[in-house]
Curated annotation (Swiss-Prot):
Cofactor remark: Binds 2 divalent ions per subunit. Binds 1 potassium ion per subunit.
CC cofactor: Mg(2+); K(+)
Gene encoding the protein: metK
Record-linked HAMAP family: S_AdoMet_synth1
Protein name: S-adenosylmethionine synthase
Family statement: Belongs to the AdoMet synthase family.
Taxonomic source organism: Anaeromyxobacter dehalogenans (strain 2CP-1 / ATCC BAA-258)
Length: 390
């Protein structure tokens, strides 16, 4: 029996967290390549530490990329523009170690095969309007509001920050927020009282639904006391270190592959996006209230070696019918995924902070629910509804 009454916790980090800085630089490189060369192959990793950025990877493209300029522009947009913050876009060194993609990989990918082996997961549930788990969606809401408040005038806030939200479930449904943790980098000069008041009033109160907050909700702000040293000075940043933040906050499973810095021929990214697209349409169609999809690939082979659908006992029709409907409605080869979701556009830098899923921007094509009717028909749900209405 699944747990019915429990607490579930998810975390998010701001765009100024060093690992997210690395993700955004890697995806800025990918976008720069796709603008000039949609057929370019990109596997870009970034590392940041005090005073420098290192960009490394395998990139095969006709595009001409100014890597140092791109890195500095990204860091500047994030907000690190002074040595007082521990990192300065204007003075940081940028090291570049980029080679071409191995021809051994290229011979399989160029003919439409998967760029690597592996399994990828997609997940959706009906806990929020975005069909995302409540804990991760609320954690992202806090970090987004933290960045918004910083840019709106709370000049003692710095770009680095994290949130953590614990949601109480009863009978399997989210009913209240039990604990909120916010850790934000700040200027040395600000008092704890001023900081705590600002975060409570300008961040938490604006980010989270009032109906889920009560007198018993614990609010913890910078629990260690102070957070002056942050960003790459406080922690080394590396691409691909926040894969649970990027996805479902631990509520859905993860195949292990990171997203940022990878062009869509890499199924680590594109098939995970397709998994989300499928799961979201299953839930939107009313076929289930929770859905997880697993797809798996072999390198150089176009069709997935397996497709699995798990609805955790919430399906309105047999899961086998849903799985067959998925294969009927969705193209699952890398080429079909890329074409179906229009993934050769330079849209990836925006995905690299505040989650790849549960977003409302139109560029996030994998968040559409335009296949729900076709899926319901293919799974036989429309016939069941028609009979029930007679």
């Amino acid at each position: 029996m699944p747990l019915q009454d429990f607490l579930f916790t998810s975390e998010s980090v701001t765009e100024g967290h060093p690992d997210k800085m690395a993700d955004q630089i890697s995806d800025a490189v990918l976008d720069a390549v796709l603008r000039q060369d949609p057929k370019g192959r990109v596997a870009c990793e970034t590392l940041l530490k005090t005073g420098y950025v290192m960009i490394a990877g395998e990139i095969t493209t006709k595009a001409r990329i100014d890597y140092p300029k791109l890195a500095r522009e990204t860091v500047r947009r994030i907000g690190y523009t002074s040595g007082d913050m521990g990192f300065d876009a204007n003075t940081c060194a940028v090291l570049v170690a980029v080679d071409q993609q191995s021809p051994d990989i290229g011979q399989g990918v160029d003919t439409g095969g998967a760029g690597d082996q592996g399994m990828m997961f997609g997940y959706a549930c009906d806990e929020t309007p975005e069909l995302m788990p409540a804990p991760i969606q609320y954690a992202h809401a806090v970090t987004k509001q933290l960045a918004k408040a910083r840019r709106a005038g709370l000049d003692f806030l710095r770009p680095d920050g994290k949130s953590q939200v614990s949601v109480e479930y009863r009978d399997g449904r989210p009913v209240r927020i039990d604990t909120v943790v916010v850790s934000t980098q700040h200027a040395e000069s600000v008092s704890n009282k001023r900081l705590h008041e600002a975060v409570r009033e300008q961040v938490i109160a604006k980010a989270l639904p009032k109906r889920l907050l009560d007198r018993k909700t614990r609010i913890l702000i910078n629990p260690t006391g102070r957070f002056v040293i942050g960003g790459p000075m406080g922690d080394t940043g590396v691409t691909g270190r926040k894969i649970i933040v990027d996805t479902y906050g631990g509520m859905g499973r993860h195949g292990g592959g990171a997203f940022s810095g990878k062009d869509p021929s890499k199924v680590d990214r594109s098939a995970a996006y397709m998994g989300r697209y499928i799961a979201k349409n299953v839930v939107a169609a009313g076929l289930a209230s929770r859905c997880e999809v697993q797809v798996a690939y072999a390198i150089g082979v176009a069709e997935p070696v397996s497709v699995m659908v798990d609805t955790f006992g919430t399906a309105k029709v047999p899961e086998g019918k849903i799985a067959r409907a998925v294969r009927e409605v969705f193209g699952l080869t890398p080429r079909a995924i890329i074409e179906g979701l229009d993934l050769l556009r330079p849209v990836y830098e925006k995905t690299a902070a505040y989650g790849h899923f549960g977003r409302t921007e139109k560029t996030f094509t994998w968040e559409r629910t335009d296949k729900k009717d076709a899926l319901a028909d293919a799974a036989g749900l429309s016939k069941i509804r028609a009979v029930a209405s007679v």
